[in-house]
Amino acid sequence: MTPQSATQNLSLRPGMKKRVGDKVGNIRLNAMDGSVFDLFSLRGRPYMLSFFRFASCPFCNLRMHELVSRFGELGERFTVVAVFDSPLDNLREHAERHHAPFPVLADERGIYYRQYGIERSVAGVMKGMILRMPTLLHALFGKGYVPLKIKGSMTTMPADFLVDERGVIQLAHYGKDEGDHLPFEAIKQFAERHPA
């Protein structure tokens, strides 16, 4: 291995968080629509790469609802890539109801979660349940996002990455608790700075 290739591989070590200025590597995963999604197919387009928890997570389903219902505000070129810590069949069971106009992927083995340094935290789960109780109750009882079948890690924390047309991360947001996603307004501002 040459020093250059060793340096390039440092960002792919498990547990290493991505930072602003890092280039994204390719992601190839099964999509909910039955295709195999290739992240490099988005070259030349800005997007948000969003890592969710397990497919029946109430906070995740509330976030998916927000992204789908407000997707039109992000412009024609901008898209979202949603990755879940669940098997494809479980993902379909819980996420198809959203009718997402963007790719929804299953990373059942957590390959890309490790590559992106996505954290697992029992404290983050507890913090989210306590500090976001009104949101959790709304998700459970207002929207019906009840996690009857949990397939995936319960301790996975969410993460969002805003990526420019060159495949460079412009913003990396690692959730501090189970419901901590990048605010929609930040996504919208980024999309507006990268118009069609």
What residues fall within each predicted segment?
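Short, positively charged
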Residues: 2, 7-9, 133-144, 192-196
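N-terminal "domain-start" segment that seeds a small globular fold
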Residues: 3-40
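Short loop/turn microsegments at loop-to-beta-strand junctions
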Residues: 24-25, 48, 157-159
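Short active-site neighborhood of thiol/selenol oxidoreductases, capturing the structured segment around
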Residues: 39-68
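Short beta-strand/turn micro-motifs composed of small residues
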Residues: 52, 84, 164
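Thiol/selenol-based redox catalytic cores and closely related redox-interacting motifs
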Residues: 107-179
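A short, polar/charged loop-to-alpha-helix boundary motif
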Residues: 178-193
